[in-house]
Amino acid sequence: MVSLSCLISYGECLLETVQTHPWSTIGVVVFLSSVKNAPLMWHARLIIAVFYHSVTRKNDVVTIERYGRQGLFGYIVTSSRSPLYECDINGHKSDSTYFSDLDINRIHLITRLFKGAGDLSLRPDRPNVAPEDRPKKMRVLLGGTCCSFRREIKPYAAYEIHSRVLAWDEKWLYVVSYFVKPGSARKMASLQTEVGDKCEMTDLARSMVFTSAITKFVFKDGRKTVRPADALEEMGLLSASEEVVEISEAGEDLWTRSRVEERRKTGIKIAQHFIALDELHDQFEHVSEHPFLGKFGVLGTMF
């Protein structure tokens, strides 16, 4: 047990160090409080996430048998703060930094939910499908993302990112992400039993959200695009059968295939607005019709 005299001695030494090297102390404090933005830290966080799900927890696979059909829509949650280097001139988290946070959160979701994409040994048996018809090694590639900002995140404020599968169509799988206050999910769960009015629940949910984002992914087997529904069935996350499956880690609220499809259709209605943004690519053809107002480099007109 540390004695009081030792703590006092340690405090005096620390104070002396601060007084002797004030600028070095400030530098260390700033670095430690912004370690999230240190060089190569983004890469390290990404590699750690992939290693954890692909090596350390390789056999912890999400399947219908373990989590039920609702497991496909399960959330991945990551937590973070907004350090000094992420703040803009307005004094809150810069808009551009949301995307680097999303990268880390989504890599957790992809490597947790779609482990069977790149590893055939983690996929369930499909006796009714010929081996040559099954995708060999699928890649999950990012196709686009978009953020809708609602409220600012203050410097060093804590927040969580909740992401899940929203829907899918013939080519793309859509993921929705929410930047929310810590503990929002638990609060919503407790309020659901207390608040009966759906409009009131919607208002409460909206008040907890800082930012919402939507992302689309495509499954690739070599250069061939794999339909999301086929990819999900291949990984044991989607079943065409209405048969109720015995599950080990989900609650008693068992989902049918019809309910999954209903949830997909609800999500695709929202995703349609994101899909429409692909038409923006065609608008560049009119570039010659409008004047150029200036061209600038990294440091204005100098470079």
Swiss-Prot record:
**What job does this protein perform?**
Thioesterase; part of the gene cluster that mediates the biosynthesis of oxaleimides, cytotoxic compounds containing an unusual disubstituted succinimide moiety. The first step of the pathway is provided by the HR-PKS poxF that serves in a new mode of collaborative biosynthesis with the PKS-NRPS poxE, by providing the olefin containing amino acid substrate via the synthesis of an ACP-bound dec-4-enoate.
Against Pfam families, the record matches this protein to: 4HBT_2
Q: Which family does it belong to?
A: Belongs to the lcsJ thioesterase family.
Summarize induction of expression: Expression is positively regulated by the oxaleimides biosynthesis cluster-specific transcription factor poxB.
The record's GO molecular-function terms, alphabetically, read:
transferase activity
Q: Cite the EC number.
A: 2.3.1.-
**Pathway field:** Secondary metabolite biosynthesis
What InterPro entries does its record include? HotDog_dom_sf (IPR029069), THEM6_lcsJ_thioesterase (IPR051490)
Q: What is this protein called?
A: Thioesterase poxG
Keyword list (alphabetical) reads: Transferase
